[in-house]
Amino acid sequence: MKTLLIDLDGTLTIDEEHVDYIDKKPNIILIQTLKEYKKQGFKINIFTSRNMRTFDGELEKIKFHTLPIIISWLKKHDVPYDEIIIGKPWCGYDGFYVDDKAIRPSEFISLNYEQIKELLKKENPHKDGGNK
């Protein structure tokens, strides 16, 4: 199965300071693109580090306090998804994620699936990404 792991804050949402999570604006173009991938049969997993710092990585607290807000926001903005995965480690304000299968939100919006596959081949020419 083809699966997309999509970040929430700053990817599905428009990142604005001093705006509560429930009031974050949706990235409409990205959500429209996500719907197209869903039509193509992709499984969509939302993978988020929301409130990992706030609750010091305590997943039960995040499930209780944060997950209902996430679900409400996704429904409000008609975001297709199959699963929500909480607990993505937070890289901090000055850190970042490094992954051979990652693309930027702007690339997800502007490139089609074949172009994305070609882009990812530059980092890892093996179709399985080394995962056997």
What are these regions (language model features)?
Residues 1-132:
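Catalytic phosphate/metal-binding cores of nucleic-acid and nucleotide-processing enzymes, i.e., regions
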